[in-house]
Amino acid sequence: MSQLVYFSSSSENTQRFIERLGMPAVRIPLNERERIQVDEPYILIVPSYGGGGTAGAVPRQVIRFLNDEHNRALLRGVIASGNRNFGEAYGRAGDVIARKCGVPWLYRFELMGTQSDIENVRKGVTEFWQRQPQNA
């Protein structure tokens, strides 16, 4: 199975979700000067920022990570977290990334996610990779 790549702010909500998920994952560094490059296809798990529009919805660190053409080329799908208090903007980073990168928006969950979210993502990620061609 290919990997998960995620970003978590200092609130650590996404980090806690990843820990509960119990699947191999690589973290995009919080420090903007640190860079990572992936070597296999991955699903991105990302929090949504801001309270409304698309501007600012995607964390800067994630934008920098995806601006690396090599990293962007290996992106296969996106899962977003958010806060339902923001209405239509809930999980907006997933929508923005999916649209701009031409990949499916696979799931969204609120804050740290529920046990049901953990189970849905675990099952969904496994099934997603099983449907992908071997060299994708």
From Swiss-Prot:
Biological process GO terms, please?
A: protein modification process
Which Gene Ontology MF annotations are present? FMN binding
Q: Highest taxon of the source?
A: Bacteria
Pfam families found in the cross-reference section: Flavodoxin_NdrI (PF07972)
**Protein family membership:** Belongs to the NrdI family.
PANTHER family annotated for this entry?
PROTEIN NRDI (PTHR37297:SF1)
Q: Write out the function statement from the record.
A: Probably involved in ribonucleotide reductase function.
Protein name listed in UniProt:
Protein NrdI
Q: Which organism is it from?
A: Shigella boydii serotype 4 (strain Sb227)
